[in-house]
Amino acid sequence: MNIDMNTDNKKTLREITEACITGNGDDVTNSRMCIIDAEFRRGFNMLEKHPKSITFFGSARLKKESKYYKPVRDLAEKVANLGYAVVTGGGHGLMGAANQGAYEAENGTSLGINIDLPMEQTLNEYLNDSIDFHHFF
């Protein structure tokens, strides 16, 4: 079973998982492939809306007081002002700095693609849009 991500792009992770398991019964491999496929297409559908984007990759544990926070925020703001969407994992630290810069830029777009991990990050408050994943690609 496949999920139509053209019509179901806003499904939650739980809804995707339940639909894939229900549609595949006891076939664990096909259920898992269905979930991975749906998550993958969901991510591409989101990024397709932003053909010009730059990813900032870095630690969620960087403190706002760090000497690196402001330069990352400033760079992301400049990138956003050039018309690029800023993409991060949606967490705090360096990701939050980049998202903040884009979010506060004039006409900036700040995106978070968050991996759902137990006892890990929460999304930062500087996102225009975000999606969650179970699987890390």
Regions found by a protein language model. Give the residues of each.
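Conserved phosphate- and dinucleotide-binding cores of soluble alpha/beta proteins
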Residues: 118-137
